[in-house]
């Protein structure tokens, strides 16, 4: 079980607990449950890498305590 921190730079910082086998789409659904936005409208980035929904967190080497950038469409 890992904890990922997502910051949208607008004052909202979300901490989500998930597994490394979970996909980015699963992570977006957990974030959407906490923020109240639809998961389809969420974009997760790290630097210039936009994360795809079907790839797992382990494949992107997302570890415990990692910060991701949260954007809305």
UniProtKB/Swiss-Prot annotation:
Cellular compartment(s): Cytoplasm
Domain Ubiquitin-like, residue spans: 1-73
A molecular function (GO) term: protein tag activity
Single Gene Ontology BP annotation: protein modification process
InterPro entries assigned: Hub1/Ubl5 (IPR039732), Ubiquitin-like_domsf (IPR029071)
Record-annotated membrane-spanning stretches: none
Gene Ontology CC annotations of this record: cytoplasm; nucleus
Superkingdom of origin: Eukaryota
Keywords: Cytoplasm, Ubl conjugation pathway
Protein's recorded name: Ubiquitin-like protein 5
Organism: Danio rerio
